[in-house]
Amino acid sequence: MATLHIEHPVTDFGTWQAAFDRFAHVRQESGVCGHRILRPVDDAHYVVIDLDFPTAAQAERFLGFLQTKVWTSADNAPALAGPPQTRILEPVSRG
C-alpha cells in the first residue's frame, strides 16, 4: 500500500470539490483504492488529499498525470491557488 499525499491552497472548496469529482473515473482506472479529503480547522482555503494505491509505482504514475495533465490546466484545476506539495508515503506502523 502506498499513499499519494497532496496539499495545496484553493480559492474555493466547492469549486475544487467539483473538479476533484470529475476525475473519479481516472482515479479508479489508475488504481486508487481509497481516498481522504481533509481541511485544516483554521483554513477553509486549504485542502489535503490522501490517495491510496496498491503500489508506489501506481502512485508515482498518477502523480505524473496530475503534474502534466491536471495542475497545468486552469480548466482541470480551476480552484488551485498555489503549487501542490506532494509526497508518496508507505506505512511503517499502524495502531
Go through the PLM ranges and name each one:
Residues 87-95:
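Short, low-order "capping/linker" segments at domain edges
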Residues 9-19:
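Short, surface-exposed ligand-recognition loops at beta-strand->loop->(often short) alpha-helix junctions
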